[in-house]
Amino acid sequence: MPKHGKKYRKATEGTEQIGLTVEQAVASAVEKAYAKFDETVDVAINLGVDPKYSDQMIRGAVTLPNGLGKEIRVACFVSGEKEAEAKEAGADFVGGDDLVAKVKDGWLDFDKAIATPDMMAKVGQIGRVLGPRGLMPNAKTGTVTFDVASAVKEVKAGRVEFKVDKAGVLHAPIGKVSFGAEKLLENLKSLLETVNKLKPSSAKGTYMKAVAVATTMGPGFKIDPLAARKYSES
């Protein structure tokens, strides 16, 4: 078991508490942050779903009201008049065959990718490169669309894509420690509301089984699942 430094051990004091309110958990995560850089605040949600069934594979996206606190570099795989639309909306890299070829040569200097439906056959050629890195455009998350301008603006504004893993756990960032508790809570509420709306009818029992908030270097703070659900519905 790895040994943690004094700062981490000090930060973990009191984290054995469970059943915190949403407000308590977020405030504690911010208060206990100790790194010299502006840490990202992440949320882990254990859902009562079985991802091996396609109708229980929770996947989606949400535009956080306060963004993520970082510049998102967007690559748009488009052609024709859509190129000008993408550039005007603020896309960092725009192209068709040339952009696909660039990725084939090893270029991956972007954070999100958007494509029009007619370009997906060509983008599929680099699926093995984009997929494992979470960069593959997907219609379910709104990154395969003819409305390129809206997609670019949403991603730039702090649109977060999420997907449950094999264990049914969903991970997503909700901002930076420097945001302060109030803005982080607003972002978390948007995330919880979106996840709650995606509950499949085939999922039985408790949907939000466990929720925890943690900073990049800090410990996790467990939120009472019932409190999380009520917060998402308030």
Swiss-Prot record:
Classification via Pfam families: Ribosomal_L1
SS bonds (residue pairs): none
Keywords: Repressor, Ribonucleoprotein, Ribosomal protein, RNA-binding, rRNA-binding, Translation regulation, tRNA-binding
Coiled-coil segments: none
PROSITE patterns: RIBOSOMAL_L1
GO MF assignments: rRNA binding; structural constituent of ribosome; tRNA binding
Gene Ontology process terms (BP): regulation of translation; translation
GO CC entries: cytosolic large ribosomal subunit
Subunit comment: Part of the 50S ribosomal subunit.
Function per UniProt: Binds directly to 23S rRNA. The L1 stalk is quite mobile in the ribosome, and is involved in E site tRNA release. Protein L1 is also a translational repressor protein, it controls the translation of the L11 operon by binding to its mRNA.
NCBIfam families: rplA_bact
Family classification: Belongs to the universal ribosomal protein uL1 family.
Name used for this protein in its record: Large ribosomal subunit protein uL1
